[in-house]
């Protein structure tokens, strides 16, 4: 099958990009022909994806949606595609609109294309599902896709006897607040190995091998599911605060907010964070080891994707979709202008940031040359 992912950016290691990338990697591994099209394509993520044999392009308007069996859409990219019945087009295409947040315009539902085309609407949490239904997205079409982890993250034989204190504490964050950075330093003073994976630390894609046994992970969102899959207790805290280690009392509430920390907005200081990370570690390990298999299956990625594939044959015919699109043509053109504006503004934003980084590098070089001696 041919499968298309149309997203805003394929450049940074962020959840909005990594979610479709992981789905594409799985489908590509099954032998499907996958394309990821993004408004902005750049290092470091895009080359990693392209090297696997997945097609990468920044020309979304050059693509015909009806050439694909499944189209996964994010960030108001649907209006940028063409919808043309030509030789080789599919009789049916399943349209999946994925929403991974409700905080920004980019992540909220579209106005015309989405209501007309959506066969499946993805929300990454129960809270986001409620938000989408308040915006008149039909609830029976929403699938909660809780940032599940790919098979490679799941460790079959987790350590049976956890250490009394974590041997390592890994912070995974692109936006860690000061109290977390300070807490990491306090853990280091206790003799615990610490590391920061993110834009202010070591900027790499998180892999299963990075998440070793007998350690703790401090993060929110997608990395929490990674940690759960590895059998490593996640300490849920970031810029929104958070509940800390997962417990019987807070698990479902934290999950309903996608482990973002927005379940409680609890903010504490660095000293308390460090104490909780160290002192609460054994109990956090025991809680994680006791999670029932049925609950853990919720966070396995592959069954969700298989369910999507099974729905392709029941998608509406593209001929019927085309008739509906033609009837709404003036409104669709309006939304296309908006989507082009989003694309151009984002590209300009990225180009401006790149220019600023270049100027800073050149300024540092000039200062070094001008230093006496």
Question: PLM features: what roles do these ranges have?
Answer:
Residues 222-287:
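Catalytic binding pocket for nucleotide-activated donors in carbohydrate/polymer assembly enzymes
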Residues 7-19, 177-179:
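A short, glycine/small-residue-rich beta-strand->loop->alpha-helix junction that serves as a flexible
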Residues 105-110, 130-134, 143-165, 205:
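Acidic anion/phosphate-binding donor-loop and adjacent secondary structure
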Residues 71-72, 117-126, 217-218:
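A short beta-strand/loop micro-motif in the catalytic core of glycosyltransferases
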Residues 106-119, 210-211:
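A conserved, positively charged/aromatic
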Residues 15, 159-160, 263-334:
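A charged, aromatic-enriched C-terminal amphipathic alpha-helix characteristic of glycosyltransferases
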Residues 73-79, 99:
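Short His-centered aromatic/hydrophobic patch
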Residues 16-27, 44-45, 308:
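Short amphipathic alpha-helix
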